[in-house]
Amino acid sequence: MSALGVTVALLVWAAFLLLVSMWRQVHSSWNLPPGPFPLPIIGNLFQLELKNIPKSFTRLAQRFGPVFTLYVGSQRMVVMHGYKAVKEALLDYKDEFSGRGDLPAFHAHRDRGIIFNNGPTWKDIRRFSLTTLRNYGMGKQGNESRIQREAHFLLEALRKTQGQPFDPTFLIGCAPCNVIADILFRKHFDYNDEKFLRLMYLFNENFHLLSTPWLQLYNNFPSFLHYLPGSHRKVIKNVAEVKEYVSERVKEHHQSLDPNCPRDLTDCLLVEMEKEKHSAERLYTMDGITVTVADLFFAGTETTSTTLRYGLLILMKYPEIEEKLHEEIDRVIGPSRIPAIKDRQEMPYMDAVVHEIQRFITLVPSNLPHEATRDTIFRGYLIPKGTVVVPTLDSVLYDNQEFPDPEKFKPEHFLNENGKFKYSDYFKPFSTGKRVCAGEGLARMELFLLLCAILQHFNLKPLVDPKDIDLSPIHIGFGCIPPRYKLCVIPRS
């Protein structure tokens, strides 16, 4: 090697050491929770398994404790792992950690709506949206009748399969999508409607893509990856297409709005906008309402749809559990009466199975990212304002003290020694605190009523031997994505 080459190599090495030294000084300048040492530019990327980030969090928690610091690129994040740390962060520090961490794939919704909003409007918009949802029957009789009506359409669609194999992805998804569409737009779609199926495809594809390694990488290195080809472009395009559809519906509602007789949640939001028409500072705008409605449309469709689809796969894996459910349904409801929420009190096994499905699949394992809204002392550590806070829900739902053998699907996790339903404070699939899922009440009702209705009328028939059914998710990231499968539903005599 020439003298020039040696000199250049030494200069590069010296520059690298200088960067490491500067990074170490910055990293140690705060009393942060412990964590692995971050490298310049990439941070702790090598400590994360992008195909299964929750698994990486568990491994790091075993090494550094229930509260630890990571850097992904230059982004600092503090991970809360385990029931005590997660509950403390989300409830005792609900204001300090109520911000929303940045998700670049959803920048079209940034600082608007109720899910991805980290701006000054989210609290007021969320509060009004929740109040309006409750007034329209969230968790009460109004939504019960909505779901019961939709169960009728779902059962008719299932009968039309005539016992032949089908992919349940969109057929099952039609029911929760129609329920939320009725709340938002007072609209019911035919199960073969092309626009309806297109919307569900967009929701499903985005939930799938957001859970892939590339999107995990993109959401942490957007400035480097934004202009490269990749699936992030598809997600951004899909978000824009859904937003355009919702925008058209909002404009139609605005043109026919009667402020004295709101028809649905969209109308209620528009009425609030009209009240602010002459205000200098406006909380409600057409674009903001569009994003709020799009947020609710996506969340109200995909999460319940995926949970139901995963639940049917689990029940085919364990036919003895399905048989117990049939027995309980026959005893409490009978063959023809429509399932009702009041039945839940007399159906502890069904209630336990619905809870165990949600616990077992941990649909959103690492929660949506939170953000520290101010400098905060947490367990003696300083968590600076702007730090991303990750309360890991899977670490609570898979706690092996509360749920022995958490890797196994066991409805007994939610049953006492007398076979009665047993509540667990560790059951947090919807998160908790100020960012708890806005549709928790609706989702819980849908899961119980729709699963009851399906099993009241049909036996589930897998295309393979139950012991060969693989329940492992195909992707674990933003969500846990179940494998694609087909099944047959056989009418019960």
Swiss-Prot record:
Lineage, top ranks: Eukaryota, Metazoa, Chordata, Craniata, Vertebrata
Similarity remark: Belongs to the cytochrome P450 family.
Gene: CYP2E1
Superkingdom of the source species: Eukaryota
Protein name: Cytochrome P450 2E1
Catalytic reaction list: an organic molecule + reduced [NADPH--hemoprotein reductase] + O2 = an alcohol + oxidized [NADPH--hemoprotein reductase] + H2O + H(+); (5Z,8Z,11Z)-eicosatrienoate + reduced [NADPH--hemoprotein reductase] + O2 = 19-hydroxy-(5Z,8Z,11Z)-eicosatrienoate + oxidized [NADPH--hemoprotein reductase] + H2O + H(+); (5Z,8Z,11Z,14Z,17Z)-eicosapentaenoate + reduced [NADPH--hemoprotein reductase] + O2 = 19-hydroxy-(5Z,8Z,11Z,14Z,17Z)-eicosapentaenoate + oxidized [NADPH--hemoprotein reductase] + H2O + H(+); (4Z,7Z,10Z,13Z,16Z,19Z)-docosahexaenoate + reduced [NADPH--hemoprotein reductase] + O2 = 21-hydroxy-(4Z,7Z,10Z,13Z,16Z,19Z)-docosahexaenoate + oxidized [NADPH--hemoprotein reductase] + H2O + H(+)
UniProt-listed Enzyme Commission number(s): 1.14.14.1, 1.14.13.n7
Effect in UniProt of substituting V179I: In allele CYP2E1*4
Annotated positions binding substrate: F298, A299, G300, T301, E302, T303
Organism: Homo sapiens
